[in-house]
C-alpha cells in the first residue's frame, strides 16, 4: 500500500512540516511513501532548501528532467537499491527499455548541472505575470509560489480571450471551467511576460 504526494502541486509548495506528518502517518498505517517530485527542484528553490531535504521523508521519489529543467525528455526514479532493482525489472517486463539513450542522458545531466538555480528566474517571471494580470479587469489571480499562474476569467470573456491569445502565439490552457493555467519555463523571458500581458489586456478589452 502506498501514500503518494506531489510537490509542487498546482504550483504550490508543500511545507516541510506537512511532509514530516505524512511520514508519521505512513509509518503508523504501514504505508510506503512516494513523492511525485516532477517539480521538486522548483519546491527546493522556493523553500531555499536542498532537494535532498525535501526527499528525505520518502521511500521513493520521481524527478522530471524536462519540466522546468529544459531537458528534451527523461525522468529519474530514486529509492533504495532493492527498490530500484525491482523497478528495473518491472520496466523491462512492461517494455520500457530504451537503447542508445546516451545523448538524452547527457542532456539530462546538463540540465541538472546548469538549470537548477535558474529556476528562480521562472518564479520571478511568474510573479511578474501574476502581478500584471491582477491589474486587469475580468480576471482574478491565485497567489503564486513557483512557476505556475492560475487565473480565473469571466465566463463571457474566456473563449474570445483564448482565441486571441492563440493568434498571438500564446498558449493558455483551460484548466477547470473558467480557470486558466500559465507556466513559465526555460524558454520564457521577462520580455515574453510583457508581450503576454499586452495580449491579455487586448483580449480582455
Residue ranges and their predicted role:
Residues 1-155, 159-168, 172-188, 196-204:
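Conserved PLP-enzyme active-site core in the AAT-like
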Amino acid at each position: 500500500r502506498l501514500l503518494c504526494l506531489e510537490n509542487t502541486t498546482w504550483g504550490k509548495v508543500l511545507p516541510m512540516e506537512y511532509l514530516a506528518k505524512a511520514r508519521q502517518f505512513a509509518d503508523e498505517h504501514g504505508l510506503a511513501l512516494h513523492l511525485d517530485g516532477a517539480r521538486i527542484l522548483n519546491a527546493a528553490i522556493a523553500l531555499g532548501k536542498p532537494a535532498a531535504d525535501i526527499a528525505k521523508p520518502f521511500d521513493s521519489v520521481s524527478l522530471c528532467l524536462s519540466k522546468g529543467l529544459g531537458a528534451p525528455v527523461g525522468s529519474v526514479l530514486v529509492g533504495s537499491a532493492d527498490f530500484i532493482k525491482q523497478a528495473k525489472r518491472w520496466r523491462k517486463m512492461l517494455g520500457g527499455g530504451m537503447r542508445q539513450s546516451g545523448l538524452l542522458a547527457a542532456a539530462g545531466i546538463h540540465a541538472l548541472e546548469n538549470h537548477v538555480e535558474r529556476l528562480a528566474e521562472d518564479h520571478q517571471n511568474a510573479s511578474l505575470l501574476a502581478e500584471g494580470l491582477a491589474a486587469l479587469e475580468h480576471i482574478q489571480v491565485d497567489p503564486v509560489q513557483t512557476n505556475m499562474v492560475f487565473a480565473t476569467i469571466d465566463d463571457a470573456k474566456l473563449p474570445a480571450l483564448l482565441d486571441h491569445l492563440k493568434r498571438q502565439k500564446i498558449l493558455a490552457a483551460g484548466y477547470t471551467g473558467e480557470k486558466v493555467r500559465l507556466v513559465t519555463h526555460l524558454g520564457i523571458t521577462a520580455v515574453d511576460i510583457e508581450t503576454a500581458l499586452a495580449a491579455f489586456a487586448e483580449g480582455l478589452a
